[in-house]
Amino acid sequence: MSIVTYQRGDTTALSKNFTRDEFECQCGKCTAQMIDTELVDKLQHIRDVLGVPLKITSGYRCIVHNASKTVGGSPNSKHRYGMAADWRTLNRTVNPVALGIIAQAVGFGGIGIYWHPKAAMCHADTRTGKATWLCTTPRKYPSTTYQKFILPTIRRGCTGEANRAATKMLQRLL
């Protein structure tokens, strides 16, 4: 893990497909932000394997933005340290459960699936331990386990070309 601090307005390329501003705090007031290079490397690997663009819906969050009513983030959120991203495929071509499986396969420590009317995305972070959760109702986060929730989903199969490619890759890995 290597945390790098960037200034607001910096357009540095973090990888082949990600720029610094994609991970910027959405409060609009922060002058600097932190980004874990391991986070970017793993997301780039997922993007390369899937062959579809990823949309970062939330990257770094300052303390104020993380605690805001719009976000309602945990006080210990990995977003506050630049170690987490909420993301999905650009055109929502892969469901968030499949994205969670892929995130687990590339070695993310924290994986959350958000799948409710206001969101359909995956949270991934670079924590050293393991944590998984599923959120199907806004602001309610029951814990789950890889065995109970994520693993059975991949075995049922999926539809769509991008989902089929993700399934094949994961079946080789699991």
PLM region spans:
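Solvent-exposed, flexible loop/coil residues
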Residues: 10, 18, 22, 64, ...
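Extended, low-complexity, intrinsically disordered C-terminal regulatory tails
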Residues: 40-72
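The substrate-binding groove and active-site-proximal loops of carbohydrate-active enzymes
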Residues: 29-34, 84-90
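Active-site nucleophilic cysteine motif
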Residues: 39, 46, 77, 83-84
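N-terminal start-of-chain detector that recognizes signal peptides
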Residues: 27-29, 55-61, 94-98
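Extracytoplasmic cell-surface/polysaccharide-interacting catalytic and binding patches
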Residues: 1-49, 128, 138-174
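Catalytic cores and adjacent binding grooves of peptidoglycan-active enzymes
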Residues: 75-83, 89-174
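Generic detector of short, locally flexible boundary/turn motifs and exposed helical patches
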Residues: 19-23, 50-54, 86-91
